Every structure is written in structure tokens, then in C-alpha cells.
């Protein structure tokens, strides 16, 4: 598992997705753990 905030940083974004609401963006400080595959998809990779 990789913090989505970290994955977002890789994608050049300083925001992370909410685990409970994948369609919304959460502040950078929100701790949200999902699989790196899911995070990568959300970043359009």
C-alpha cells in the first residue's frame, strides 16, 4: 500500500483522494492508503 498523497506527489499533484469518496479531492494532509495501482489510475498513468 502507498499513501495516495505520495502517489499524487509523483503525479505532480499536492492533493490526495478520499478513500470513502474516490470522486472527491482531499487536502494534502489527509492520510489515505490505497493500492499503488489505484493511485496510479487516479493520476492518469
Swiss-Prot record:
<feature type="disulfide bond">
    <location>
        <begin position="18"/>
        <end position="32"/>
    </location>
</feature>
<feature type="disulfide bond">
    <location>
        <begin position="11"/>
        <end position="26"/>
    </location>
</feature>
<protein>
    <recommendedName>
        <fullName>Pollen allergen Amb a 5</fullName>
    </recommendedName>
</protein>
<dbReference type="InterPro" id="IPR036712">
    <property type="entry name" value="Amb_V_allergen_sf"/>
</dbReference>
<keyword id="KW-0020">Allergen</keyword>
<feature type="disulfide bond">
    <location>
        <begin position="4"/>
        <end position="39"/>
    </location>
</feature>
<dbReference type="InterPro" id="IPR005611">
    <property type="entry name" value="Amb_V_allergen"/>
</dbReference>
<feature type="disulfide bond">
    <location>
        <begin position="19"/>
        <end position="43"/>
    </location>
</feature>
<keyword id="KW-1015">Disulfide bond</keyword>
<comment type="subunit">
    <text>Monomer.</text>
</comment>
<dbReference type="Pfam" id="PF03913">
    <property type="entry name" value="Ragweed_pollen"/>
</dbReference>
